[in-house]
Protein backbone atom coordinates (compact mmCIF):
# COMPACT_ATOMS: atom_id res chain seq x y z
CA UNK A 1 0.00 0.00 0.00
CA UNK A 2 1.18 3.53 -0.70
CA UNK A 3 -0.03 6.75 0.90
CA UNK A 4 0.49 9.88 -1.18
CA UNK A 5 -0.42 13.53 -0.94
CA UNK A 6 -2.64 14.95 -3.69
CA UNK A 7 0.41 16.65 -5.17
CA UNK A 8 2.49 13.49 -5.37
CA UNK A 9 -0.51 11.52 -6.70
CA UNK A 10 -0.81 14.10 -9.50
CA UNK A 11 2.88 13.68 -10.29
CA UNK A 12 2.76 9.88 -10.21
CA UNK A 13 -0.51 9.37 -12.12
CA UNK A 14 -0.78 12.52 -14.28
CA UNK A 15 -4.48 12.60 -13.31
CA UNK A 16 -6.37 15.84 -12.76
CA UNK A 17 -6.80 15.47 -8.99
CA UNK A 18 -8.52 18.58 -7.58
CA UNK A 19 -7.38 20.48 -4.52
CA UNK A 20 -9.84 20.21 -1.64
CA UNK A 21 -9.95 21.19 1.99
CA UNK A 22 -9.16 18.73 4.77
CA UNK A 23 -12.86 18.76 5.67
CA UNK A 24 -13.65 16.81 2.50
CA UNK A 25 -12.62 13.44 3.88
CA UNK A 26 -13.81 9.91 3.35
CA UNK A 27 -13.06 6.51 4.75
CA UNK A 28 -11.82 3.50 2.87
CA UNK A 29 -11.35 0.10 4.45
CA UNK A 30 -8.92 -2.73 3.89
CA UNK A 31 -9.49 -6.24 5.26
CA UNK A 32 -6.55 -8.26 6.57
CA UNK A 33 -6.14 -11.37 8.68
CA UNK A 34 -3.65 -9.59 10.99
CA UNK A 35 -4.62 -6.01 11.84
CA UNK A 36 -1.93 -5.70 14.51
CA UNK A 37 0.86 -6.61 12.05
CA UNK A 38 -0.38 -4.08 9.48
CA UNK A 39 -0.56 -1.32 12.10
CA UNK A 40 2.94 -2.21 13.33
CA UNK A 41 4.30 -1.92 9.79
CA UNK A 42 2.46 1.36 9.17
CA UNK A 43 3.83 2.79 12.42
CA UNK A 44 7.38 1.75 11.43
CA UNK A 45 6.89 3.66 8.18
CA UNK A 46 5.78 6.83 9.97
CA UNK A 47 2.07 6.60 9.13
CA UNK A 48 -0.29 8.45 11.48
CA UNK A 49 -2.16 5.88 13.60
CA UNK A 50 -5.43 7.52 14.66
CA UNK A 51 -7.09 4.47 16.20
CA UNK A 52 -5.25 1.52 17.72
CA UNK A 53 -6.56 -2.00 17.00
CA UNK A 54 -9.65 -2.78 19.07
CA UNK A 55 -11.97 -5.75 19.06
CA UNK A 56 -15.51 -4.51 18.42
CA UNK A 57 -18.57 -6.06 20.11
CA UNK A 58 -19.31 -8.04 16.94
CA UNK A 59 -15.83 -9.66 17.06
CA UNK A 60 -14.08 -7.71 14.31
CA UNK A 61 -10.69 -6.09 15.02
CA UNK A 62 -10.59 -2.52 13.68
CA UNK A 63 -7.89 0.17 13.57
CA UNK A 64 -7.58 3.49 11.76
CA UNK A 65 -4.74 5.31 10.03
CA UNK A 66 -4.71 8.60 8.14
CA UNK A 67 -3.17 9.31 4.76
CA UNK A 68 -1.13 12.52 4.19
CA UNK A 69 -4.32 14.41 3.21
CA UNK A 70 -6.10 13.35 6.40
CA UNK A 71 -8.41 10.73 4.88
CA UNK A 72 -9.32 7.96 7.29
CA UNK A 73 -8.36 4.42 6.33
CA UNK A 74 -9.87 1.52 8.24
CA UNK A 75 -7.74 -1.58 8.67
CA UNK A 76 -9.99 -4.43 9.80
CA UNK A 77 -10.23 -8.16 10.15
CA UNK A 78 -12.81 -10.11 8.13
CA UNK A 79 -16.38 -10.19 9.41
CA UNK A 80 -17.15 -13.73 10.52
From Swiss-Prot:
User: Which Pfam families does the record associate with it?
Assistant: Glyoxalase_2
Matching entries from Gene3D superfamilies are given as: 2,3-Dihydroxybiphenyl 1,2-Dioxygenase, domain 1
Coiled-coil residues are none
Matching SUPFAM superfamilies: Glyoxalase/Bleomycin resistance protein/Dihydroxybiphenyl dioxygenase
- What protein is this chain from? Uncharacterized protein YsfE
- InterPro entries linked: Glyas_Bleomycin-R_OHBP_Dase, Glyoxalase-like_dom, VOC
Question: Start and end of every VOC domain?
Answer: 1-78
Q: Which gene encodes it?
A: ysfE
